[in-house]
Amino acid sequence: MKRFLNCFMLIIFITAFCEAKVNQWDKMKEVYENIPLPTFPDKTYLITDYYNGTDSLYTSAINKAISVCSAQGGGVVVIPDGVYKTAPIRMKSNVNLHLSDKTLLMFTTDYNLFDTVLTRIEGIDCYNISPLIYAYGETNMAITGNGVMDGMASEANWFSKERIDGVTLKNGKKVAEKTVLYDLKEDSVPFEKRVFKGKTGMRPQFINLYKCKNVLLEGFTLNRSPFWLIHPLLSENITVRKVKMQSHGYNNDGCDPESCKNILIEDCDFDTGDDCIAIKSGRDEDGRYWNIPSENIIVRNCRMKDGHAGVAMGSEITGGCYNVWVENCLMDSPNLSRIIRIKSNAIRGGEVKNVYVRNITVGQCDESILGMEMKYWHVDDGPYPPYFHNIYLENIKSNKSRYLL
């Protein structure tokens, strides 16, 4: 049945709506104006100048061009038109990695070519095989251009890995790598001893920015990711603009800022196998160890074609989530379960507050405009009950959904 849902002044645990609404949208403008974009010297480095002419992969050429560019004060590393295959790329400060219009960058699925790096997998700190593009502690960076990057993930490689490889326990039982990671977290094993590499490595993210600042991701297309597509982690001042995300594998979230501050996601296209955007801040004891929220997140002018939720907060939200603005987005898919979804449980905990949503057009979604779950994953009890408050929705129009809330 066709339903028209005009949710002007839908208030969840809110008082003084009109006054707060005006002030908070003004605050969004302040946050936006204080997210700096990176700048680069007018110097160009072609990856083909660093290619030896014999390697089957361009990994060495790309990473050497990036290292030289950064060491010489920065500039633009250009991947010219053409098809290139590579292992993981390591980004560095003051480098703009630019994909030309007709560039196709394909990533190998041979995990033996992947280094081991510090990251988080589903909110749990560990060392894992490297994301396809990784940066740690870098500043003033960009990945730009209209080219395509293909993670090559399929059932023939990454998505069957957990079933085929896994980890063999002392009793001979084989379990998935993430099951071992969950157990290490529950046993409070230190981060540096949670190491997954080579055959025991878990599916990596496409782009992982760990403790980075002042980063621009703009223009390119991401296809077939092994895991989450864009994962800023413990980072600040990140702009994701005009990026097309097309990936329908398991856990293929589009953009997941985790324990981040000042994030702008605008004019992007999401066609993903999981949440289009999922804001996170760590999980359980790891999240409480860091206790760093995600805050000041702006999502605007985006198109969500497919995915589980349009914009989610959680479920790994232990560190909290504050000040989220979502506006002027189009969401339309029978596979979108909820337009806005907030999820946690009494083990993960976390406070979510000050979420402002307006001017959203929904062609259809499967379940509801807003979903809030405090017993996510069927967890009824625990010592850390989550707290969701100050959630505002205004001018949400849906042609088809089973429920409002």
Task: Annotate each PLM feature.
Residues K43, G75, G82, A87, ...:
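The right-handed parallel beta-helix/beta-solenoid scaffold, focusing on the short coil/turn
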Residues G53-S56, N252, D256, C260, ...:
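Alpha-helix capping and helix-loop boundary segments enriched in small/acidic/polar residues
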Residues G74, T86-P88, T108-T109, I129-S130, ...:
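Short glycine/acidic-rich loop motifs that flank beta-strands on beta-rich extracellular proteins
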Residues D101-K102, T139-G147, K213-N223, E236-S247, ...:
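Right-handed parallel beta-helix
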Residues I317, L336-L405:
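Extracellular beta-rich repeat passengers
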